[in-house]
């Protein structure tokens, strides 16, 4: 039995979909009763639990031998993951699969990488078999700009002229599901990227083609990005951490292209054009 933690988010919902399609036994950890009812209505078994309430986890982990976890960008994310790792070890979980990030390590040059790296190290020291799926920037993150693209034909990011090897969340999930369901992925770290590195202008061109109308990339400063993030309610510490990642784009540190997705899943990684076409309506296509 697999426990999916974070099963209502961008990556986790795809993991749930793939496991359900494969008719594999799993349950999703859910703390919100409304979301539990929604998943139950789709035939997904759920378990009540909250990473911020460790006492709720032992019951949810009953009968579970594999765990997949992805957590949101929140101030207490390290503690949330740590609580699950401790509970999983105590429950006798055999294989712990975690979505982290490219370059995640305790000595990463960026804060988010260090946060994720701390939990990776905890899993490695736990005695459980582990697999880390380490994505770069998600294509789905562009959906947060969909309204601006529809209304103004523009999106704003602090990437300069740098290129990013955007990855589709569906491919991140596919790698995770392979790790959960097929042998040979134990104790492996899988950095995953899309099949091509694109500049902001190239992303805009792909969105234009999908939407059937002009879309323009507007490069903004890190300070402008911070103001936008904190203006939407993000804590300043997290906005600063995100800006550390964005700052890696102009020197093309985010432009590396790896073949992990086809090697692990047996199918090519999705292109940005495929993603844009799949979400054309969100970006303003008639």
From Swiss-Prot:
Pfam families: NmrA. Gene3D superfamilies: NAD(P)-binding Rossmann-like Domain, UDP-galactose 4-epimerase, domain 1. It comes from the Bacteria. Keywords: NAD, NADP, Oxidoreductase. The keyword Oxidoreductase applies. NADP(+) binds at residues 6-11, 31, 136-141. CDD domains: TMR_SDR_a. Optimum temperature is 41 degrees Celsius. Optimum pH is 6.2-6.8. Its EC number is 1.7.-.-. InterPro entries: Ergot_Alk_Oxidoreductase (IPR051604), NAD(P)-bd_dom_sf (IPR036291), NmrA-like (IPR008030). GO terms for molecular function: oxidoreductase activity. Monomer. Belongs to the NmrA-type oxidoreductase family. Azoreductase type 3 subfamily. Catalyzes the reductive cleavage of azo bond in aromatic azo compounds to the corresponding amines. Uses preferentially NADPH rather than NADH as an electron donor for its activity. The enzyme reductively cleaved Orange II and carboxy-Orange II, and can also reduce several sulfonated structural analogs, which carry a hydroxy group in the 2 position of the naphthol ring. PANTHER family: PRESTALK A DIFFERENTIATION PROTEIN A (PTHR43162:SF1), PTHR43162. This is NAD(P)H azoreductase. It comes from Xenophilus azovorans. The gene is azoB.
């Amino acid at each position: 039995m697999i426990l999916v933690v974070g099963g209502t988010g961008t990556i986790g919902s795809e993991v749930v979909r793939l496991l359900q399609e494969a008719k594999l036994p799993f349950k999703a950890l859910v703390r919100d009763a409304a979301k539990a009812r929604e998943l139950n209505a789709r035939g997904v078994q759920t378990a009540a639990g909250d990473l911020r309430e460790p006492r709720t986890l032992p019951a949810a982990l009953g009968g579970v031998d594999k765990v997949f976890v992805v957590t949101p960008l929140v101030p207490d994310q390290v503690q949330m993951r740590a609580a699950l790792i401790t509970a999983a070890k105590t429950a006798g979980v055999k294989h712990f699969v975690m979505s982290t990030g490219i370059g995640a390590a305790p000595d990463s040059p960026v804060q988010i990488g260090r946060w994720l790296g701390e939990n990776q190290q905890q899993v490695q020291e736990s005695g459980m078999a582990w697999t880390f799926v380490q994505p770069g920037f998600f294509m789905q993150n562009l959906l947060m700009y969909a309204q601006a693209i529809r209304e103004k034909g523009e999106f704003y990011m602090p990437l300069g002229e740098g290129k990013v090897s955007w990855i589709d969340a569906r491919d991140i999930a596919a790698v995770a599901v392979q790790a959960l369901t097929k042998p040979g992925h134990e104790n492996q770290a899988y950095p995953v990227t899309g099949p091509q590195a694109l500049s902001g202008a190239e992303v805009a061109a792909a969105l234009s083609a999908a939407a059937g109308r002009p879309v323009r990339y507007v490069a903004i400063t890190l300070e402008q990005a911070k103001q936008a993030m904190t203006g939407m309610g993000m804590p300043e510490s997290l906005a600063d951490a995100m800006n550390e990642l964005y700052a890696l784009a102009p020197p093309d540190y985010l432009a590396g292209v790896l073949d992990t997705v086809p090697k692990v899943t047996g199918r090519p990684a999705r292109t940005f054009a495929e993603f844009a076409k799949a979400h054309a309506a969100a970006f303003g296509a008639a």
